[in-house]
Amino acid sequence: MVKNNAGIVNMFEKRRTQTTTIPIIEIMREKRSEDLETEIVQGLQFDSLQLPQELLWDDAGQILFDDLCNSSTYYLTKKEKEILQKYSTDMAATIPEGSTLIELGCGSLRKTGILLSALEKSHKAVTYYALDVSQDSLENGLAQLHKGLGCLDHVELRGLWGTYEDAIAWLADQHPINVHNGITFLWMGNSMTNMHLAQAQSLLSRMTKTCIGSGIPCQILVSVDSCSAEDIVMGAYDTDSQPLKDFIMNGLKSANRILGKDVFCASDWTFGTVLDRVRHEVQVFYAPTRDVTIHIDSHPCKITKGEKIAVISSGKWPEPYFRSMLEGIGLQVLDLWRDSDQFYCMNPLPLICSFPG
């Protein structure tokens, strides 16, 4: 058991700090704003309208999501933090000496400090990379992480500025001698389930196969929310929640910034959430409060009052569902940790998976 974990977490309360000398590698291959503009236009031409979820994760969105994570009804962060505080020593034991730890979509890095502290106390030389699409969030998150952990003798902190796809391309260029003891991917916050099942399978498969193709052993430490209690789930995504509203509606501001003009007038839009029991996910969408016509270049799009535009989903995957997904791409669960309540349906489930053979 790692002592004083709560103290480590409390050091991250201040959001902004002066950036440190922690190296950040820019791995972004293309200007993401141009890609997003194309995705916005294309998404509004589909029969089922959609906007890219990356609109939610700009610099302002990262801060607003942090507010959501700290809200009273958002159980995911609390459960995951509890698991980390209880099992961080066990998790650290699965990460080899001299290996690389890459966190996918690192966000504020509050919870990460618990695991890195356990690695430091176990005297394991590990190189930690925080991957994020937001440069501002990455710089400030790493600075706060460095401040919270203090002087590190064994764990080295670095950053990767880019997307998941950029990370896969970057991994393909890594020589085994640089990561001879392998890579552990850390994917927390239930972020994997923001993708649909097939998308998550594809990303996991490509990450592991890229490592195997480069001769690099790898494993994945991932948290999954499998809560089936609908009142608890929908309480976390209550549309009356101001933190949730601020976070989701910021996505339209982000879209306007990407497009270079106010295409989405805030007063014309609201958002909603719905539980899809078949897909085991909460779906979040925008909807206009009146009939609107959106003009983007030569692509006018008429949207009727109440018509849904999907933006993000959050999976609530039961264990059999998740295991089946892994088996479909040749992965297997090696270990599993739950929170102390032992209510499976309420717990994010950190799992370690490896690529067999």
Swiss-Prot record:
Family statement drawn from the similarity comment of this UniProt entry: Belongs to the methyltransferase superfamily.
EC number of the protein: 2.1.1.-
Organism: Aspergillus flavus (strain ATCC 200026 / FGSC A1120 / IAM 13836 / NRRL 3357 / JCM 12722 / SRRC 167)
Entry-linked InterPro entries: EgtD_Methyltrsf_superfamily (IPR051128), MeTrfase_dom (IPR019257), MeTrfase_EgtD-like (IPR017804), SAM-dependent_MTases_sf (IPR029063), SAM_MeTrfase_EasF-type_put (IPR017805)
Pathway(s) per entry: Alkaloid biosynthesis
Annotated protein name in UniProt: N-methyltransferase dtpB
GO term, biological process aspect, one: alkaloid metabolic process
PANTHER family referenced in this protein's UniProt entry, alphabetically: ERGOTHIONEINE BIOSYNTHESIS PROTEIN 1, HISTIDINE-SPECIFIC METHYLTRANSFERASE SAM-DEPENDENT DOMAIN-CONTAINING PROTEIN
GO molecular function: methyltransferase activity
Disrupted gene: phenotype observed: Abolishes the production of ditryptophenaline.
Keyword field: Alkaloid metabolism, Methyltransferase, S-adenosyl-L-methionine, Transferase
Free-text function comment from the UniProt entry: N-methyltransferase; part of the gene cluster that mediates the biosynthesis of the dimeric diketopiperazine alkaloid ditryptophenaline. The nonribosomal peptide synthase dtpA accepts L-tryptophan and L-phenylalanine as its substrates and forms the phenylalanyl-tryptophanyl cyclic dipeptide product cyclophenylalanyltryptophenyl. The N-methyltransferase dtpB is responsible for the N-methylation of cyclophenylalanyltryptophenyl to yield cyclo-N-methylphenylalanyltryptophenyl.
